[in-house]
Amino acid sequence: MIAIRGPRGVGRTSFLLEFAKEFFDPQLHQALYISANNFYFQGRGLQELVHEFVDRGGQVLIIDQAFKLPNWKDQLVEIYHAYPYLRVVFSTTSVHGEGANANHELDRITRSYVLHGFSFREYINQQTGLELGTYTLPQILEGHETILKAILPKVRPQEHFQDYLHHGYYPFCWL
């Protein structure tokens, strides 16, 4: 089981959709993307849907906004034990799965990845198509003039800064 965590607007949904599109052929019906924020799940659990999906040959279940399901942690653990060959990828916010509401069984069977917002450098790369590299603090302190001479002919960072402050940290929530 894989958890994709991150705050609202960081791009969890975009990531899951891109993952499904890139790795699974829709004609083969091997993967199913569902949004738990759907009226279908009001008063219903995942079990019936998962059972039918697996019976039809489904192999990968992608659940967006899993935290919207009632008792979502318990449901995911049940699915894990009932369908050991089913791969499950789900998204949740950073705060879910922590504190008093933690499900230690889910934590044990899940590998979590956190999506972070973009750095200013990443935002410029995404906006311009450039591949500006990273620098360590000592590199910046010792060679800032050389670094500027390499960057400024390619891009004018100040032209992107206000947009970055407005929507650059979470660039995918504006798509």
Roles of regions detected by a PLM:
Residues I4:
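Hydrophobic anchor at the beta1->P-loop junction of P-loop NTPases
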Residues R8:
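The conserved Walker
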Residues R12-T13:
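Conserved lysine of the Walker
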Residues D25-N38:
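Conserved catalytic segments around the Walker B and adjacent sensor/switch elements
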Residues Q42-V89:
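Conserved nucleotide-sensing/catalytic segment adjacent to the nucleotide-binding pocket
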Residues H81-N103:
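Sensor-1/coupling segment of RecA-like P-loop NTPase cores
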Residues T93, N101-L175:
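Interdomain motor-coupling "hinge/lid" segment immediately C-terminal to the ATP-binding subdomain
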